Amino acid sequence: MHSSALLCCLVLLTGVRASPGQGTQSENSCTRFPGNLPHMLRDLRDAFSRVKTFFQMKDQLDNILLKESLLEDFKGYLGCQALSEMIQFYLEEVMPQAENHDPDIKEHVNSLGENLKTLRLRLRRCHRFLPCENKSKAVEQVMNAFSKLQEKGVYKAMSEFDIFINYIEAYMTMKIQN
């Protein structure tokens, strides 16, 4: 097991373990979540930094996949659904394809995906951060544009992963302040 994956697992286990007499694991995990969020975002950014240059060098397109409308959805009433759908999109569509583009980056993309899965798990445990059902038009537009780009879509989506992390941060900051 690689050190970043091991560290991620340790952070998750530490945040989930409840102290005796202090409520459920979920409750304790949720009270610590706002404090752990900066570390989780840093882990995502660190993992992305290992593949960023590769994908940005391969991304020859001038258009933007993750547009401002997606950030607006993250900040609006569809924020929960937009975040949930985008995490699912990256985990199920983008990253599996990205892993197959070069054996040298497969491990790093996998590590990035594991960090994103850990974030999703923590968000799901804390229902106030992900209590949603509606569909986001901005996410639908991202997915349609990604599909139209075919193989180049992977480069585009992965090269913009840092924008996605910033949008996650904006959403979570807004939710923590409310």
UniProtKB/Swiss-Prot annotation:
Glycosylation (residues): N134
Keywords: Cytokine, Disulfide bond, Glycoprotein, Secreted, Signal
Any one Gene Ontology cellular component term annotated for this protein: extracellular space
Cell compartment(s), UniProt: Secreted
GO biological process: immune response; negative regulation of B cell proliferation; negative regulation of cytokine production involved in immune response; negative regulation of inflammatory response; negative regulation of interleukin-6 production; negative regulation of membrane protein ectodomain proteolysis; positive regulation of B cell apoptotic process; positive regulation of cytokine production
Keyword Nuclease applies: no
Single annotated GO MF: cytokine activity
Domain of life: Eukaryota
Disulphide bridges: C30-C126, C80-C132
Stored InterPro entries: 4_helix_cytokine-like_core, IL-10, IL-10/19/20/24/26, IL-10_CS
Annotated signal sequence range: 1-18
Pfam family, one: IL10
Family: Belongs to the IL-10 family.
Function: Major immune regulatory cytokine that acts on many cells of the immune system where it has profound anti-inflammatory functions, limiting excessive tissue disruption caused by inflammation. Mechanistically, IL10 binds to its heterotetrameric receptor comprising IL10RA and IL10RB leading to JAK1 and STAT2-mediated phosphorylation of STAT3. In turn, STAT3 translocates to the nucleus where it drives expression of anti-inflammatory mediators.
SUBUNIT field: Homodimer. Interacts with IL10RA and IL10RB.
Record-given protein name: Interleukin-10
